Every structure is written in structure tokens, then in C-alpha cells.
Amino acid sequence: MKKIVLILGVVFLLTFNVNATTWFPSEHTCPVCKHKHEYQEIGSYGGYIYHRPSKYQYVYWPLTDFPSVYCCPKCHFATYMWDFDSIPENKVDTLTKFLSTVKLEKKYKDYLDIPMTTRLEIAENVYKILGQDNEFWCKFYRVQGYHYDQEENKEKAKESRLKSLDYARLMLSDSVYSGQEKEILFIIAAMNNFIGQKDSALIYLDKASLLTYENKKWKEENVKGLDEYLTDLIKQYKEFIRKEDEE
């Protein structure tokens, strides 16, 4: 009996680890107010993150997880974790002025205790000061919509997804993103689906399925990999929508 329990325990651990994502603590200094605080950094993950349900919103781990948006508990400066330490010096004064207007409901000792959508709302204004391109904003509002949805704020989630949709359309008409239409049309389909426009979503999925993804800035193997992933995901998405309609 003990052997069976032990074997089952090992099987459980192996199953858990196959899909596990891990974080570890690391101290960072806020580039605005110089406050030192313990944040979380990525430990481990695998390709399984691209097969989680958030793929239907074209949002992936780590941005689906709470530690991914850093926020200084003192001045409330907030960005994605990978941008936190690389803020241009010439933006600090403007950021300081903006952050002086940010008022939270209470003081937080740990950044993880600050609601994710609150951090994203601050980060939205921070990134407006820093300046970002259409692709960034298209993704940012998908992420924001995802987290509003997680908090069951359907109205805010829809607002964010409509913004993502607007940026995706801008990308579609911009020659900078030439060759990436398959991915952009998929994003448009995904956002349409999550604002309740399922018929439009299916139309855009059909359009995307006829294309091949291209990106001259990437290695050929990476381009091929994303194209194959999108092809498979489009098929899955059509089935996903049909199943939703049957429920």
C-alpha cells in the first residue's frame, strides 16, 4: 500500500512539473524613487504555456500571471517586469510628476497585493509617457482585457479589447507589419470573439487561414514555427467557437 501511495505521489509530482511555471524572489531598485523592493522573476516554464486557454485571447504566460507587472509600493511606478530597470533618465521627471497624482486605496507592503488591473492602469499611463508603437498597445490592451475579465469586470474588459482591436486594424494597414497579416487577422478574430461578435470572428479566422505568416526580421525556423502554430490555433479556435454556440 505504501508503495502504491509513493508511486502515485511521484506520478502527481511529475504531472505537476510538466505544466509548472515557477518564480523566484529578486531585489530591484525603482528607477524613479530608488526604493528597493523584492519582486518575482521567472524561474522555469515550457512550451505548454502556448496551449493554455488564454491562447484564445492571444495572451500568454507570464503576462497572465500576477508577478509579471512590477509596481513600486512607494511611488507606484509600474511596468512589465522586463521594462522596470530600463527607464530613460530623461523621462524620470515626467514620470515623477505623473506618479504624484496616483492615489491607491491603501498602502501596500508587497507589490503582489496591489490588484493586477490597478498596476496595469498605472502602467498604461507610464507607457504613454515612455512612448510605444501600435504592436505594443495592441498586446497591452489584450493583456489588460484578460485581467479585467479575471476580476469579472466585463465592461472594462470589453473596453480594453475594443482598444486592442483598433490597434490591430492600424497594424493591418501599416506596411511596417507587411507579411504579418495572418497573425493580425487572428488577433482581430480573437478580440471580436471576446466582445461577442462571433460571426465576425469566424470571418476573420477564415481570412487568416488563407495566409502564410512572414517576418523578415526573424529566423526562417521561427517564422515557420509561428505560421504552423497559427494554422493549428485557427482550426482549434473555429471548433472552440462552435462548441460555445452549442452550450
Q: Would you name each region that the model predicts?
A:
Residues 216-247:
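Terminal, low-structured helical/coil segments at or just beyond the last alpha-helical repeat
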Residues 198-216:
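TPR/TPR-like (Sel1-like) alpha-helical repeat modules
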Residues 123, 127-130, 167-175, 211-215:
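Alpha-helical junction/boundary sensor with strong preference for TPR arrays
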Residues 92-152, 179-194, 232, 236:
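Amphipathic alpha-helical repeat scaffolds of TPR domains
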Residues 4-16:
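Sec-dependent N-terminal signal peptides
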Residues 18-97:
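N-terminal cysteine/histidine-rich coordination modules
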